[in-house]
């Protein structure tokens, strides 16, 4: 890939305030990342769209709004552009329409603030639509985020040859943490309460609530239709595309949302994975490859006591060794965590 000509980002933080699913660090995660993008990676403020569910947010992170923002990024990208999506919020696993789709027999999804789910098949479709020479990096700090780009090649994950020895480590020092997980049954129950219809198929409720703005991959959950391969997915081999996923955990694991105990205003809530990425970037101001960044973040989480959360990397072989966000040269970080 040639050096990026334009850098465009969509940052999404969902705290689900005043609900039983409330998290605390997700908005902080993406605001810190926005500062990093500008100070270190050459992004311009006007090319970064931030969607949060804060009370004063001008654009809420609904499924439709997230989809539109990502769709604009992909549609307007030119060869050499660098696209970035950072999501911090809840994730879920959906029973697969195709039971042998992959090992966990479920599809990964993120949970926007209105529960209009966006699935791994949706992200695959976005990557397939990329123009040649455009990179699309995703950081998903959510539960079950491993494999969030469907069929992306695993570089660091459950079956990776990259092993970090799990030596004895202290448990998480700040015990006030919560998994970024909403179980599928809870998602279905919530959507059922909103739609008012009786159905065990999630697609029925999503269609009733969101119509054509729902995920196309969930419309035919009752009578599943295999996704077509006749579209833009034929432009390049699946293992040669420019989708890059840095996930907060494996597909069968949870990611942690940390809320420092007490009323210490100097310690903000954060997502464990987002914080580990930001700490690694702050401590190593030189160029880091995608592989190096994930390995260092995985090691840091282990040192912090997160022995059951393993960040993963999914991308082509070439992109595994490519610089994170195609950084060139050494740039000092001006922002703080």
Which residue stretches match the model-derived regions?
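Caspase-like cysteine protease fold
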Residues: 9, 188-266, 280-337
